[in-house]
Structures are given as structure tokens and as C-alpha cells.
Amino acid sequence: MNLTEAYLLLAVMLAVVAVVSVLFKGESGLIAPLIFVAGLITALVAGLGFRLREVTEGPFVFVDTLMWVLCGAAFSYLLYVNGTFQFLFAKVVGKKRSPAAQMFILILFIGLPGMITGTALASVATTGLMAGRYLLDKGMEKSKVVEVVTVGALMGMLLPPLCVPAMAPTIARQGLYPGAFEGYFLPILILALPALIVYCALAGRRVLGEWEADGNVEKTGSAVCLIPLAVVAVLVLCYNFLYFLIPYYGGYPVIYLIGFVLALIFKCKGANPLIAAADGIRTVAVELALILAYASVVETFNLVGVNGTLSAQMEIAGINGAVIALVLGLLVLAGGLLLGTPFAYVVGALATYLVSNSNYGSYELPMMAVGAAIAMSMFLALRGSLAETVGETLGVTGVTGTEVVKRNIIFTLVLTAAIVVFLVAGSSLKFLMI
């Protein structure tokens, strides 16, 4: 394949996804299945016929990842319906703190389901809904409520132990299946934490004002309901940092299953486990559909020769791996900004092979940074942004993602800078992977 053909096929894929992104206004749930169709069209244009097998087999690499996220979603939603999160929320708002400290604790509370599942929408549908309704009832300006829940959901997705957008490229790296999102606890924490601290310091007083303790929030049960969370936290930390001392006990699916069973025993109120699990899975379905579509694009680019041709040309040209990672990472951000998160995933699929190949042997953290750029596109997107989803969930209209971003320029720049650092210097920061 010559370079012109590679660019043509790349343009076909990007054009199809761009068109459906515009037509469906960034609705990820509608666009994700159409990305598979874009893969079929690209294969047809390449003269390879109707290649259903290749377009659909890529997502199977994420079967383990799906289990991690689905088990986490079932566990976190059970904590929502059995009263554990309500008990925690009463503690969050029941004490007087400085605005910055209160914002920090509130963001961590909202982000908790996101940390467990690696998704933003799990937070929006549970703790975000809970905190958002409370703040609206307290008379807070609607745009500020949407902002707090949006940032909380974004931070929850980015903070460890899991981050679905970062898991996609790190696991799919250069087609070398299977991969694993292990060793990334400290790197993803270091990437996200500075932006979180900056946001809380700058937005605490602006958004919350002088925070007053509220002891009237309804709560049931006792601190015993926190046992499942505590056990899961200990098991996650041991799994990530004491793996050389403790025998392997099954990873995240088993950890979350243990938490799920404990949450049926130590609870504030009764909950149907089957309904909780099903509802929890629904909260993460769209984001999981996107990584399956992403895997389909990776496989399609491999099939039609786009990845191999472009990678070979860059190798021949002697382009530095850090430059390739930086340019493609910024293209992910730009594509997500203009056309939404599904388009960012498609550009990220191209970046997966090119960045890993150009940084062979030390590609782990640049790949994580590409995933973080995809995650950030949910915050930046002009259509189908995370803020719009939050507004729909809370029943708030007229608040756009652009408005939230404009009010938090410094936060946005700090997070972008952290992503750039890992894109450019990720090879030198590999010592952070434990």
C-alpha cells in the first residue's frame, strides 16, 4: 500500500464518523454502533469486501476489561441503592469546613463510583445525582451545580484505580493482545491530582461560598455500612502495591464481587441485588460501547494497512517518538473538542499503533496519556459533552460544556499540561509504574 491509499482510507473512516457525530449531535450511544459500520465501509473502499469478522473481533480483547467495569458498576450501584452513599453524603455535608476542603471532599464523593468503575457516567447517575439535587434544593445556581457534578465525574473517571478511556489504548497497544491496566495507579494519580487540587483551591469559594454544616440531611443505618467499601479499598491497594507478597486473588472482578456480597450484608436499607446489578451495568453501557467501537477501529486500521503504512513512513522519516505522541495526543483533544468523544476514540485508535510503535519498549505511559486525552474530550466537547449529560440527568437546561470550561480555564490548562507531560516524557517516567 502506498501512502496516498493509506491517507484515503484514513479519511474515509474519519469522514464517516465525523458525519454521524454531527448528525447525532455527539450522542455517544447512537454513534458507537455506527463506528462499526464505518469500519465495514472502510474495508469495502479498500477493496477487501464485507469483512465482518475483522471489524467485530477486535472488541474481544476487552472481555477482561468489561468484567472489571461491569463488576465495579454492580458494586457501586448497590452502594447507591442500599443507602451507603446516602450515609456518606450526610457526613460530607454535615461538617463545617473551608470552601476548598469542602469542595475537595465533595468532588471525591461524587467521583467515587467513577474511581470504582473507571467511567464518568457511573458517577453522574448516582452520587452526582444525589449531590446535584441537594445543591439545587439549597438554592445554588444551576450552572454551578452542573459544574461541580461534571468536574466530580471527570475526576472520578481519571483518578485510580480504573480509567476506562486510559485502559483502552494501554490494553490494545499495537495489537499486542492481551494487555492489562496494571501498574498505572501512581501515574494516573499523579496526572489527575494536580488539576483536582487547583480546581478545589480556585472554585471552592466561588462555587460553594462560606460552607455551613447541614445536619438535616436524611441518613439511615450506621458506619457499619462502610465495611464493604473499606474491604474493597484494602484489597485494591494490596493488589496494586503488595502483589509481590500476597498471592493473586483474582483481580478487580473478584474484589468487586467480594464487595458486592458484603454490601448485601452490611447495609443501611434493603436492596434487590439483581436489579441493582442490572441498573449499575446500564450506567456504564455507553462508555463500554465506545471502547468496543474503538477496538473495532484499531482492527480495521490494521486490516486495511493504515497503521502499518503510516508507522513505516514515520520510521523512515526518523520522527521522534515523543513528537508523534504529542501531535497525536493533541489531535485526540482537538477531534474530541470539535466532534465529540466518539470521534476522539477514533483518532485515539490511530494513535494507539503509531505511538506504541514509535515508543517501543517504553510506550506504556504515553499510551495512558492518549487515553487521558480521550477522557478529557468528554469535558471539552462542543457537542455531547459531559456537562450536557449532567444537565439532562439533573433536569437542568441551558448549561453547556463550553460554559463550564470557560469558567475553569486554569483547571483545564493544568490537566492539559499534565497530559502533555506524560505524552512527551512518559518514557522517562516509567519508574512510576509499580
Identify the function of each model-found stretch:
Residues 1-70, 78, 89-90, 202-212, ...:
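N-terminal alpha-helical transmembrane segments of multi-pass membrane transport
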Residues 1-2, 133-225, 363-365, 388-434:
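Membrane-core helix-loop-helix motifs of multi-pass transport proteins
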Residues 1-17, 37, 41-43, 183-276, ...:
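Long, contiguous bundles of hydrophobic transmembrane helices that form the permeation core
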Residues 2-11, 63-68, 121-124, 185-191, ...:
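Structural signature of hydrophobic alpha-helical transmembrane segments
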Residues 19-33, 137-143, 269-270, 333-346:
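Membrane-helix interface "capping/anchor" motifs
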Residues 49-58, 170-180, 241-248, 301-316, ...:
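Membrane-interface helix termini and inter-helical loops of multi-pass transporters
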Residues 49-134, 271-358:
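Membrane-embedded alpha-helical segments and adjacent helix-loop junctions characteristic
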Residues 100-115, 138-158, 184, 321-334, ...:
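Alpha-helical transmembrane segments of multi-pass membrane proteins
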